[in-house]
C-alpha cells in the first residue's frame, strides 16, 4: 500500500526535476530584480540557491551517482551562511537608517 | 603532505587570532601577528613550490603551480595587512578586519589547490562571504553597509550560477573534476561552460556583470578595497585558467564569448572611468577594464598569452594594491573625500605620496619600465601568434584609451593650482612608507627582471 503511494509520488520522468529547478531559479532571479523589500530579496536568493539542489538530485537519479548530492549539501551550508551574513547586514542597515527597501539604499550610484 | 603546511599554518593562525582577540584587543598586536602568519605561509609555499612538492590525495591536487599561487596570495596578503593596520586604527574599524583578510586568503588558497568543482565552490565561498563581511566593516558607516549588501546579492547570484553550471557539468560528464573530458557537441556541456563562465565573470567584475564593483569598491574601507580588488583576482583567474584549459576549448567558438565579454568589459570600464569625479571610483572602473584585458588573454588557449595573463594578474595586483593603499593613507585625513579636486597640487603637501601614486598609475597604463608592460606585450604577442588579430587590435586600442584617465589624475596632482584655504596636513608614518615602498619595488623589480616571475610560471603552469 505505502509502496504504491510512494511510487506514484516519485517523479517518473527525470526531466521534470530540471524543469522545476529552472522555474525556481527563474523565480529566484526575477524576484531579486523586481522585489523592493530587502528581506524578500534575500528570500529570492535562497530560492535561487536551493533550485541548484533540486537539479543535482535529479541528475543523481538519472546517472545513479552520489557526487551531486554531496555538492547539494555544500550548497545548503553555503546558503545558510549567506543568509546569516545577509540578515546581519540588513539589521545594521536598518539600525543606521531605518531602511528596509531597495529604493531607500541608493547613496551609491552603481 | 608538506604541501599542506602553508594552509594549516594559516588555519591554526586564524583560530589563534580569534581567541587572542578576546583577551588582547590591540590592533598592533593582532595586525603584526596576522602579517607574520601570512608571510610565513607565503614564504613556505614559495619554497615548497620551488622544491616541486605536490600533494594529490582526497579531493586536493596541489602542484608546484598552485603552491606558487598560494605563495603570491599569502605574501600579498601580508603586505596589505602590514600597510593597512594604521588606516584601520585611524578609522576605528572592527578588529576582525585582520583575520577576515586571512580568511579570504585561506579560501583562495583552497580554491587554487583543487580541480574538483565542489572544493572550488567551498573555497570560493569562504573567500566571498568573508569579502562581503569585510566590505561592511566600517563602523557606523551607512555607505559601507549598503555596498556590502549589494555585493552580497550579486555575489550570491554568482554562486547560484556556479551551482547550476556544476549541475550541468556533472550531468554531461558524470564527475565533478575539471579534467580532460571527451564530449562532442553536447548542449548540457555547453550550458555548463556558459554558466561557470558567467559565475566567474561576475566574481571578477567583467562588464555586463560589473554593477556591484564601483559601489563595493567605493563603500569599503579603502585598505579593504586594496585587498579585495587585487588578491582574490589571482585565485579567480587561476580557476579561469583551469576552465580555459579544460572546458572552454571543447565547445565550438566558446572562446569568442570569452573574448567578446573581455572586449565589452575593457571598453566599458575604460570609457566610463573618464566620467568619474572620485579617484576611488575611477580606480574601480579601471579594475573593470583590467578584467577585460585578462579575459581577452584567456580567450585563446595559447601558452604565451595564458602565461602572460597570469603574470599580468600578479603584477597588476601589486600596482593596484599600492595605488589603493596610497588612497587609504590620504583618507586618514578627516576632510579627504577622494574627489579629484582634493588631489590638486598633492605633490606640495606630500611629495612621496604623490610620486608613489603617479608611479602606480604609470604602471597601470603599462609604460615600459614597469612590470605591467611585459604582461600586456605577452598577451598581445600570444593573440597575434594564434591569429586572433581582431582581439589583438581591440586590445591595443583599449589599452591606449585607458591611458587618458590615469594621466588626468596625474595632471591634477602635479600641474593644477591648489585650492585656496586648504590647510590639511598629511601625516605619514614609518609603516605606511615601508609598505608603499615594498609595492613600488615589486612593480619595478618585476618590470626590469620579468624572468624571475615568468620562469616559475612557465616552468610549473603547464605541468599540473
From Swiss-Prot, chain A:
**Where can this protein be found?**
Cell inner membrane
- State the InterPro entries in the record: NADH_UbQ_OxRdtase_chain4L/K, NUOK/Mnh_C1-like
Which membrane topology describes this protein?
A: Multi-pass membrane protein
Transmembrane residue ranges = 14-34, 39-59, 70-90
Q: Which GO terms describe its biological process?
A: ATP synthesis coupled electron transport
What EC number(s) has UniProt assigned to this enzyme?
7.1.1.-
Pfam family of the protein (one): Oxidored_q2
Coarse class of the protein's main subcellular location: membrane
Q: Which UniProt keywords apply?
A: Cell inner membrane, Cell membrane, Membrane, NAD, Quinone, Translocase, Transmembrane, Transmembrane helix, Transport, Ubiquinone
- Would you tell me the Gene Ontology cellular component terms? NADH dehydrogenase complex; plasma membrane
Q: Is Nuclease tagged as a keyword?
A: no
Catalytic reaction(s) noted:
a quinone + NADH + 5 H(+)(in) = a quinol + NAD(+) + 4 H(+)(out)
* UniProt superkingdom: Bacteria
Q: Does the keyword Cytoplasm apply?
A: no
Q: Name one GO molecular function term.
A: quinone binding
Describe its assembly.
NDH-1 is composed of 14 different subunits. Subunits NuoA, H, J, K, L, M, N constitute the membrane sector of the complex.
Outline what the protein does: NDH-1 shuttles electrons from NADH, via FMN and iron-sulfur (Fe-S) centers, to quinones in the respiratory chain. The immediate electron acceptor for the enzyme in this species is believed to be ubiquinone. Couples the redox reaction to proton translocation (for every two electrons transferred, four hydrogen ions are translocated across the cytoplasmic membrane), and thus conserves the redox energy in a proton gradient.
Q: Which family does it belong to?
A: Belongs to the complex I subunit 4L family.
Q: Which NCBIfam families match?
A: PRK05715.1-2
Q: What is this protein called?
A: NADH-quinone oxidoreductase subunit K
Give the species this sequence originates from: Hydrogenobaculum sp. (strain Y04AAS1)
| Taxonomy of the source species | Bacteria, Pseudomonadati, Aquificota, Aquificia, Aquificales
Q: Which gene encodes it?
A: nuoK
